[in-house]
Amino acid sequence: MITKLDFIAVPSTDAERSRTFYVDTLGLTPDEKGHFEFWVGGTCFGIWEPAKMGFEFAPQHNAHLALHVDDVAAAKGELEEKGVEFLGDVFDTGVCHMAFFKDPDGNDLMLHHRYSPRTA
C-alpha cells in the first residue's frame, strides 16, 4: 500500500518567519519551485499555515523531525551561537546522539547522528 514518504510538513502561524529560521538559522536551501519547501536529502520538507486552510494551529510535540548532522555537539554549539535554545544536553542512546530544540512556532526538532549501525 504505502511505498514511500512523499513529504513532511510542519505547521506555522507565520510561514515567512519560519522560512527565515529554516534558511538563515538551520541553513536549509529552499526549493526553487516552492517558496516554503526544502529538499533535505531525498525528502521534501515544507512549511504550511493551517489557518489558511481552515484548520486550527497546533505545534507538533513528541513527533520530532530528526535532522541529520555529522556532529551533534558541534552543530548544537553553532545553533546556540545563533540564539537557538536547546532542551537539555546532547543525549547518547548507545546507537545515536540527539539534541532537542524547537522552531519559532514551538514544533519539536532534533539534531541526530547515528554512530552505530542498526541491528536486525
Language-model-derived ranges and their functions:
Residues 21, 73-78:
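Short amphipathic alpha-helices within nucleic acid-binding modules
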Residues 37, 66, 98-100:
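Short hydrophobic/aromatic beta-strand element in the GNAT-like acyltransferase core
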Residues 14-15, 70-72:
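Helix N-cap motif at beta-to-alpha junctions
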Residues 1-17, 63-65, 115-120:
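N-terminal beta-strand motif that seeds the catalytic metal site of vicinal oxygen chelate
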Residues 14-28:
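Amphipathic alpha-helical segments
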Residues 26-33, 86-90:
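Short secondary-structure junctions
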